[in-house]
Amino acid sequence: MEETIGVTETAAIPKQRGEQLLDHAVRYAEERHWDVFAGTWLEPVEGRELCSCGAEDCPAPGAHPTVKDWAALATGSAVQVRRVWGKRPDASILLPTGRSFDALDVPESAGFLALARLERMQRTLGPVTLTPDHRMLFFVLPGAAAKVPDMVRRYGWSPAAIDLVVRGEGQFVAAPPTRFGGRGAVQWARRPTPANRWLPDTEELIDALAYACGREAAAERARRSS
């Protein structure tokens, strides 16, 4: 899989190629036992790349479901994955949350702060993605949505006051190397490895994430009041 991004380093964003997408989708199904499904794709139109959905103002061009009942399309079968991407090799790779994992979605700056803090504390991390819209997603065991609000309050923060979103049942995340139009590709900040096959529970990460998001929210309030 892709090289990961260090806490303080940057990396070139790989160009999305159809054959890569198939290979990655198969590995997610075979090696991680994650359900995957094919999303929209990018189409060249008059020198631009537009989403296959046809909306010029699409908020996630080439990186969202093609149908409303997308959950029924998600599969963990490598045979089915090969069949789907064989027909549409440039389709984005989307992963349903709430099945094998949930994702704790935070701003990129808060995510890097939390990542450094968690590594210093030698906490076990699961895979972590970095998106072109400057979000960082930490993969955790399913069931986070029911736990996070009380956990955040326990650490002295109001859930409504910090930018920490749980993606759980009925939602999805885009997987590397899916591209968001011309904005770039989803990347691994911490890639899936045999060592992180067993995902952490939300409790193992929430203190660092809540602290980082709370610190960022406080800084934003200070900027607005100055």
Where are these regions (language model features)?
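Catalytic core of tubulin tyrosine ligase-like
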Residues: 138
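DNA replication initiation modules
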Residues: 143-226
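Signature for HUH/AEP ssDNA processing cores
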Residues: 2-133, 143, 194-211, 215-226
